[in-house]
């Protein structure tokens, strides 16, 4: 080969190649046709056959510059060749740097640049893995879909309402249930104890259900679980305190022994068929609250659960914002975020602010007995009440069944900490002076049977409110409970007690994120699609608007409804069909046996009263042989309405006679309807009221 004075120039004419960013300096680089083609976007395509032929002829290669092209612009044939390099098109080593004794370049070797290319015979190329990169602390995300099966998100409760939270995540033959809560009855549900979701779809697909994951231990998220597990017995996964509270409910329902409860902590991942769920720590008004990262074949979902961002939490456990950000960097297909406070600007104050208010109010109470009403599940609030009581030398009494249960379980699991003998039994408080006593009680929402409400009515068996009581209601009324709370406050003040209930006193903070906190989650997660959850429609709509402000396209957001099936793919989100989701009412031990007709009758009875008409007719002649008698309940006072009732009896007699058919035959339905129509018209003309009319006709 003729001597080349400028060796670098010759190499530059032979090959143009850009060193890979991932290759360390001073490392030998193998060049194959695949490598050259893959970098043709910057330097143009190189004909390796021509290069090899030129070397055999001992002539330098003349390179003709070409316009740079993108790899995606290459013909499909060239792309295929780039993926499958041919063995015969390998080049020989033309130059190597000096090496140390172990066969590696010396550390002080001159760095490789684009013009300093070392070409060597490539080693056998390893087959590239087709699996996607595994996120830290999470199961490997699935590769790109090929069958295009959509992921189904089916809310059975919690949308367009407060409470009854329950959502299904379904992919092919796998269903994972998120939460299973209850709701309290509305004013138009007389006699109803509580409301739970409709489990019809779950029961129909029981073979697909892989498990239940719970975000936290509030009633609107775990209250209906015992009813579900009686129908579909599947594993339940959640954090320690949540599982502890669930144990009590299942024990009361008599199904604890046959239930499978599994304790998980933040960072743990549960694989349920094709769906995996990772627990992520969040702040809320109860310890051990979690959000979820849900890994599916379609993509990753993030469900925040009920959350807030508290930088000074009472228990020192902060929300794992770093993990939310990490998920965002790996790519999140859809975000499902708490919408409860999406209307409120700014950030939710820290729970510690309430503790500071307690300190001020306890000092103001002086030598009076202190009563504090709060949500029984707000363990952080209870801890701060106890801490303040200890600092002021007061013993603590707990009143109210749910408060007693939660306090006992939280103490057992180590979530409530206090000096020994701080909490005393309610029967021991008689010997404790008022200035040394604090009573923590239920009833912050004015519930009719709660401890505080019974105290206000003078019906509590062991606690009587006096003018020497200082009462703090550490909660704000849930929408719809304002009248109940107001009545309790009025009754307590009538008894002479001083009641502190104003929100301006700092005695309550929310456990839900306001707009700036939701913005923070959006900034970290960066979802492609957004599905607002947990709230009335106005809350969901405000959260949708916030998502648009944060850059999520409007068409990528769907405000769902209970029972509407949301289908999610890599490229779309839409509502396609519905499943049964009627509210199931629980009345005593009856579940679902009270429907809209029964409620209508109850409402009618409560508003207009009842009139019962009893008559006996001869089966042969059709003549009325006894009655008709009229009985009134809740309609008019009998002693003052004798004339009205006498006329009502005559109207019924005429109606029965007029309805007699040919040959004395009578249709019972016609008889009853005739009595209802004619008596109803008469009573309305006299009273402008429409009582329920119940005809009872016997035949002899």
What are these model-derived regions, one by one?
Residues 235, 531, 694-697:
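Short glycine-rich phosphate-binding loop at a beta-alpha junction
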Residues 159, 183-194, 208, 501-504, ...:
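A glycine- and charged-residue-rich anion-binding loop/surface
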Residues 1-29:
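N-terminal acidic, proline/glycine-rich, low-complexity intrinsically disordered segments
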Residues 116, 121-213, 218-431, 450-464, ...:
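His/Asp/Glu-rich metal-coordinating catalytic cores
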Residues 664-700:
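C-terminal tails and terminal domains of large nucleic-acid-associated
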Residues 344-474, 478-503, 507-663, 672, ...:
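Hard-cation-handling environments
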Residues 63-69, 73-74, 81-88, 92-96, ...:
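Arg/Lys-rich, glycine/proline-spaced intrinsically disordered segments
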Residues 4, 15, 29-31, 36-37, ...:
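Hydrophobic/aromatic hotspots within intrinsically disordered, low-complexity regions
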């Amino acid at each position: 080969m003729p001597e080349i004075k400028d060796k670098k120039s010759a190499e530059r004419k032979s090959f143009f190649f850009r060193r890979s960013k991932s290759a360390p300096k001073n490392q030998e680089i193998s060049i194959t046709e695949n490598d050259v083609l893959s970098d043709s976007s910057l330097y143009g395509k190189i004909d390796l056959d021509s290069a090899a032929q030129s070397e055999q002829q001992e002539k330098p290669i003349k390179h003709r510059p070409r316009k740079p092209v993108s790899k995606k612009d290459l013909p499909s044939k060239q792309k295929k060749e780039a993926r499958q390099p041919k063995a015969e098109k390998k080049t020989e080593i033309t130059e190597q740097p000096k090496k140390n004794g172990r066969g590696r370049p010396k550390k002080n070797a001159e760095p490789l640049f684009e013009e300093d290319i070392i070409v060597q015979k490539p080693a056998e190329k390893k087959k590239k893995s087709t699996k996607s990169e595994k996120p830290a602390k999470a199961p490997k995300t699935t590769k790109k879909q090929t069958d295009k099966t959509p992921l189904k998100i089916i809310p059975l409760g919690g949308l367009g309402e407060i409470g009854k939270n329950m959502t299904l995540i379904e992919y092919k033959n796998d269903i994972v249930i998120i939460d299973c809560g209850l709701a309290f009855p509305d004013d138009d549900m007389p006699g109803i104890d509580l409301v739970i979701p409709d489990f019809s779809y779950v029961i129909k697909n029981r073979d697909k259900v892989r498990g239940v994951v719970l975000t936290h231990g509030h009633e609107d998220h775990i209250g209906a679980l015992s009813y579900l597990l009686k129908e579909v017995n599947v594993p339940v996964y959640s954090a320690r305190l949540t599982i502890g509270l669930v144990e009590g409910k299942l024990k009361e329902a008599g199904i604890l022994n046959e239930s499978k409860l599994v304790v998980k902590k933040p960072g743990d991942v549960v694989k349920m068929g094709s769906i995996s769920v990772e627990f992520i720590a969040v702040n809320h008004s109860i310890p051990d609250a979690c959000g979820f990262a849900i890994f599916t074949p379609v993509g990753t979902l993030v469900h925040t659960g009920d959350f807030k961002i508290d930088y000074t939490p009472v228990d020192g456990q902060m929300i794992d914002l770093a993990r939310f950000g990490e998920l965002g960097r790996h790519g999140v297909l859809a975000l499902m975020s708490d919408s409860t406070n999406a209307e409120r600007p700014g950030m939710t104050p820290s729970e510690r602010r309430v503790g500071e208010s307690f300190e001020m109010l306890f000092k103001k109470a002086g030598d009076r007995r202190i009563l504090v009403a709060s949500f029984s599940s707000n363990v952080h609030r209870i801890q701060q009440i106890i801490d303040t009581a200890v600092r002021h030398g007061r013993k603590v009494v707990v009143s109210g069944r749910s408060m007693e249960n939660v306090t006992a379980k939280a103490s057992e699991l180590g979530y409530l900490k206090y000096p020994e003998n701080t909490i005393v039994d309610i029967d021991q408080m008689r010997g404790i002076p008022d200035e040394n006593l604090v009573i923590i009680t239920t009833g912050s929402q004015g519930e009719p049977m709660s401890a505080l409400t019974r105290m206000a009515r003078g019906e509590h068996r062991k606690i009587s409110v006096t003018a020497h009581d200082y009462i703090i209601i550490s909660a704000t009324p849930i929408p719809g409970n304002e009248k109940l709370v107001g009545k309790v406050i009025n009754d307590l003040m009538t008894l002479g007690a001083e009641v502190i209930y104003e929100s301006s006193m700092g005695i309550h903070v929310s456990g839900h994120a306001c707009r700036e906190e939701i913005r923070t989650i959006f900034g970290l997660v960066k979802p492609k699609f957004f599905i607002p959850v947990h709230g009335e429609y106005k809350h969901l709509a405000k959260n949708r608007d916030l998502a648009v402000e944060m850059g999520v396209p409007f068409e990528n957001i769907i405000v769902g409804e209970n029972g509407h099936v949301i289908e999610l793919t890599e490229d779309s989100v839409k509502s396609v069909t519905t499943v049964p989701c009627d509210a199931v009412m629980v009345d005593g031990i009856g579940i679902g046996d009270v429907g809209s007709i029964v409620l209508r009758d109850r409402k009618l009875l409560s508003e207009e009263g009842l009139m019962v008409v009893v008559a006996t007719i001869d089966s042969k002649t059709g003549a009325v042989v006894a009655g008709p008698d009229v009985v009134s309940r809740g309609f008019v006072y009998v002693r003052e309405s004798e004339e009205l009732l006498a006329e009502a009896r005559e109207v019924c007699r005429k109606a029965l006679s007029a309805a007699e058919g040919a040959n004395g035959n009578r249709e019972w339905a016609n008889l009853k309807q005739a009595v209802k129509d004619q008596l109803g018209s008469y009573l309305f003309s006299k009273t402008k009221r429409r009582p329920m009319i119940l005809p009872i006709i016997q035949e002899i």
